Regions:
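N-terminal secretory signal peptides that target proteins for export/translocation
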Residues: 1-7
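Generic marker of residues within folded, mature protein domains
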Residues: 6, 26-28, 60, 188, ...
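Bacterial N-terminal signal peptides
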Residues: 8-22
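Compositionally biased, intrinsically disordered/low-complexity regions enriched for serine, proline
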Residues: 19-22, 189, 485, 508
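Glycan-processing catalytic domains of CAZymes
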Residues: 26-399, 405, 413-416, 424-425, ...
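A conserved amphipathic helix/loop scaffold
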Residues: 408, 412-650
Length: 650
């Protein structure tokens, strides 16, 4: 009996030992819903050779932002890391529970502020690229390529090699060869188990012109990474809109539908106010990035304080980023000041958003098709996102979607008209932009509806919703005098198509949203302003009418001013985020009768407005609203530069 008891006791402790020893190690950052990585550029190797410097910087960064991983760079702009110090530095981090992976910036530096890439027609540049890859492969099992792996050179050798090909075709073909011959094969020859991750930048509309290739190249690498840095939307040269930090990660998830998109990456550049940095962090994580990389180690470790920037308009409001709370939360290492810096801005903001991410399911949105290697109405989806339309961008035609949104870039699919017809014939709907209509009007789209862009433009400031004999009402905001918007003129046949939203200039009407029944589906044409950013200047009534048709059966839709985004998830949760400098009030419409809505952060249960089942004769329009399910409406006050998280239950 005693022997049996001892055997059972031994078996119990041995089982416990196995369970503990086989459990995955705890990550240093301690976040529940994501990992945090910090990218160390190549010059860190020189500083980190002094272990006292390394220890001091490590303590400082970890006190500001808890992190799980570092990407340690071995090459950038003609500079190599000291190989002799790499293993020692790696051990320092791994001994403290931090994962260490490699980094490469395969670029040659630039001139006059422009980015410079290798000239891959030069043997010495090809050799240097290969050498850098081989060094990384010797020291790391995972290596990420920073987003300078493109091709700008137009040397005499490049011009001769290009021949009669376009620059786009030449660069795509060249970079496909470079990817295999100078990166993947050399790395795997040295380290067969290596994983090479390619980070793609934020200018996805123009990739093909510089040799980036989401169609083939992105599939060859072991994973991809997403540049979600959007910075300031008004003063930078790119003018990227805030919504892109979410949208581009979702798009790249669909490019690598096998789960190969490893995360999002932001930096601290070109910011006019401190809130803009956490907004990029939050939006990357609202897109469900499994990892977020902070570029770079230096601003995380710097001793210099940062300025909150131009945020006087909202600094006393209850915003999601609270400058004072962030400053007071920092406990510096002994002997250092408590001055705030970007590291603590990141750390505080990540800690806050980690509280709610677990309540969000898988992101969903209105599906929009952008073929590989396509351009047209560039970055339009981010402007649509910023007027409150959740977008799910995909490189494959989404035949399963109830409605497909097609912008001008869809013209790069030679079979797009046939796909549209098939979709409509199956009882589903298609909405095309005026840019795509113009591109296809001599390529078969008139088989669906004989509408065309005339080439003329008109300035519109008055808008009407509703249609039918004597029906319609102003969509202008009586409290705000909206500016005039320049739009293309679309010609159509009366009674073949109906303008469910129209603009009026003097005594003439111009369609903003056209509707046509084709087979079993509905075909829409959405007129896009000549300046896409004028979507922000459309009256709120116009954008809400567009949403009613585009999101007819969508779980949640939002009546809102511009610069307020909506992120929706398949478990009924959603996020409302304002990028505005002022307070805003929105109305969210949730599918279902008497749905309960709860603020996921405060626990507050919101009071519903009178439930609206669409359409109703007492609505202010007669037939402007499409048939749809019963919905429950709620009014929500949103502070400036803030997000609110909600969960629903029937």
């Amino acid at each position: 009996m005693q022997h049996t008891f001892r055997l059972a006791l031994f078996s119990f402790f041995f089982t416990c030992f196995l369970a503990v020893s086989s459990a995955p190690p705890a990550l240093a950052g301690g976040y529940r819903n994501f990992r945090v990585a910090v990218y160390c550029v190549v010059d860190a190797a020189q500083r980190f050779a002094d272990e006292k410097v390394l220890q001091a910087e490590f303590d400082r960064v970890m006190a500001r932002v808890k992190f799980d991983k570092v990407y340690f760079e071995v090459y950038r702009n003609r500079h190599f890391a000291d190989e002799a110090s790499l293993d020692k530095i790696k051990r320092f981090f791994t001994d403290r529970g931090v994962i260490v992976e490699g980094g490469l910036t395969l670029a040659a530096g630039g001139r006059g502020g422009q980015f410079g890439t290798f000239d891959f027609e030069k043997p010495e540049d090809r050799a240097e690229c290969k050498k850098a890859v081989q060094i990384a492969a010797r020291h790391f099992d995972t290596v990420i390529l920073d987003d300078f792996f493109f091709y700008t050179s137009k040397s005499d050798a490049d011009i001769a090699a290009k021949g009669k090909r376009s620059w786009t075709q030449y660069r795509l073909e060249t970079m496909r060869k470079v990817s295999t011959e100078l990166v993947l094969k050399p790395a795997r020859a040295i380290n067969p188990k290596i994983k090479i991750i390619i980070k793609y930048p934020n200018w996805y509309e123009h990739f093909q012109g510089l040799g980036y290739d989401l169609e083939e190249q992105a599939q060859w690498f072991d994973g991809i990474y997403t540049g979600t840095e959007t910075r300031d939307p008004y003063v930078t040269d790119q003018l990227l809109q805030q919504y892109e930090s979410y949208e581009i990660l979702r798009y790249f998830n669909n490019v690598r539908s096998d789960g190969g998109n490893r995360g999002g990456w932001i930096d601290t550049f070109s910011l006019q106010y401190a809130d803009r940095y956490p907004e990029q962090l939050w939006d990357t994580l609202f897109a469900k990035a499994p990892e977020i990389t902070l570029f770079s180690w230096h601003p995380m470790a710097a001793l210099e304080t940062i300025d909150p920037g131009d945020r006087d308009a909202w600094k006393k409001k209850p915003t999601s980023f609270n400058w004072d709370d962030m400053v007071n939360s920092y406990k510096p290492p002994k002997g250092e000041s408590a001055a705030p810096n970007w590291g603590r801005v990141a750390g505080w903001s990540l800690e806050q958003v980690d509280r709610c991410l677990g309540k969000l399911g898988n992101p969903i949105g209105v599906k929009s098709y952008k073929p590989f290697q396509s351009t047209g109405e560039d970055f339009i989806h981010n402007y649509l996102g910023n007027i409150g339309i959740p977008i799910e961008l995909t490189p494959k035609f989404p035949s399963d979607a109830d409605i497909v949104l097609l912008s001008e870039s869809a013209k790069f699919d030679r079979d797009i008209v046939a796909k549209m017809k098939k979709h409509l014939a199956s009882g589903k709907n298609v909405m095309v932009t005026s840019g795509l209509l113009r591109a296809l009007q001599d390529k078969g789209i008139k088989d669906i509806a004989e509408a065309e862009a005339t080439g003329r433009t008109v300035s519109i400031r008055d808008f009407i919703g509703g249609f039918g004999a004597g029906k319609g009402a102003s969509l202008n905001d009586p409290k705000h005098d909206n500016p005039a918007v320049l739009v293309p003129e679309i010609r159509f046949f009366t009674n073949d198509m109906w303008a469910v939203v129209r603009g009026v200039a003097a005594a003439r009407g111009f369609p903003i949203l056209l509707m046509n029944h084709y087979a079993k589906g509905i075909f829409y044409v959405l007129t896009i302003p000549e300046n896409i950013s004028d979507l922000y200047n459309l009256p709120r009534g116009v954008t809400s009418a567009i949403k009613a048709h585009l999101q007819q059966d969508f779980p949640v839709r939002m009546d809102s001013p511009a610069q307020v985004a909506l992120f929706v998830y398949d478990n009924g949760a959603f996020v409302v985020e304002s990028f505005r400098h002022d307070d805003s009030e929105v109305t969210v419409s949730v599918k279902g009768d008497h749905v309960k809505l709860k603020n996921a952060l405060t626990g507050e249960v919101l009071r519903e407005l009178v439930p609206v089942s669409e359409p109703k004769e007492k609505n202010r329009f007669f037939r402007d609203q499409p048939m749809g399910p019963t919905r429950t409406n709620f009014k929500i006050a949103v502070p400036p530069h803030s997000y609110l998280v909600f969960t629903t239950e029937e």
